Amino acid sequence: MASGNLPWELEEEILCRLPLGSLVRLRSVCKHWNDFFNDKWFIKKSLGCARPQFIILPESKIYSIGTIGLDGVDPKIEVRELACQFHFEAEKWAFTAACDGLLFRDFWNQGVTIWNPWLRQVGWIEYKENRDFRFCGVGYDAGKPEKGYKIFGYFNRFYDTKLKIDHRFAIFECASQAVKFIDSPEWPMLAGRGEYVSLNGNLYWTAYNEETREHFLGSFNFSTEISMRFCLLPCAKHVSGLRDKLVLTVFKGDRFALLKQSRISKDTKVLTAQYGPKARTKKNENAEKACLKSYGSLKPDRLEKLKKSMKRY
């Protein structure tokens, strides 16, 4: 039977929809397929089609947790151990961050590893003379054609006379390993205490205003090096001081999802954004509380049943 060649465009469309693990194994088929891994458009589209997975880091091993057959009658959870080429002690690292499919891991007072889980490539950034630098998150200047990753963090400043600790925020450029300090009077209010999430090169985090008792999303733009409040969060003002527990993540590749749990009632809700940062217009910039809307909720009794089922698994 005669065989024919598919158009390159059709091959790209098929390959970008394959699972990343299978796609890596196809690099050796031909030079053109291997070149896809250096094509920014192909990488972006492939990551956009990929099903999100969890990465867990127990002690010295790394695992990925994915779902198989969610659309069928017999969905399964797949747990895979991922090979890593670096060794660490669990107590020596503090933070992790993801950006463009890369995993950044901070080793306290030592440096940061940049790890591509699927290509099994590991890079190391050493802090050298800046060992007191505290890692927060990763981003890049979205206005430039080439992505130069930058680490957002801070240095502790100690005041001996009053025994107070202050933070001085800075940007650590991965390529040049240069540190640039950022001074702003808004930092005490805008600095978040939770995890920082990277989206379109910018950083976002949940923060809290002690004076107004309002939760909101803070943001940092690596292009302008300006921090600002992105939107208010629909959280109750608790006079008791017990704040809602918040977990922020990226949803559908271009917007946010927020898991919110009340520390009083233990009710858990999932909120999703109708639009992403790029889609914000002058019309909806003022409608801050409409930024995130409820997607679903989970009562404490159902959450307890879910925990028990997870323990059995």
Curated annotation (Swiss-Prot):
Q: Which SMART domains is this protein grouped with?
A: FBOX (SM00256)
Start and end residues of each F-box domain: 1-46
Q: Which InterPro entries match?
A: A_thaliana_F-box, F-box-assoc_dom_typ1, F-box-assoc_interact_dom, F-box-like_dom_sf, F-box_dom
CDD domains for this protein: F-box_AtFBW1-like
Taxonomic placement: Eukaryota, Viridiplantae, Streptophyta, Embryophyta, Tracheophyta
What is the recorded name of this protein? Probable F-box protein At3g44130
Which Pfam families does the record match to this protein?
F-box, FBA_1
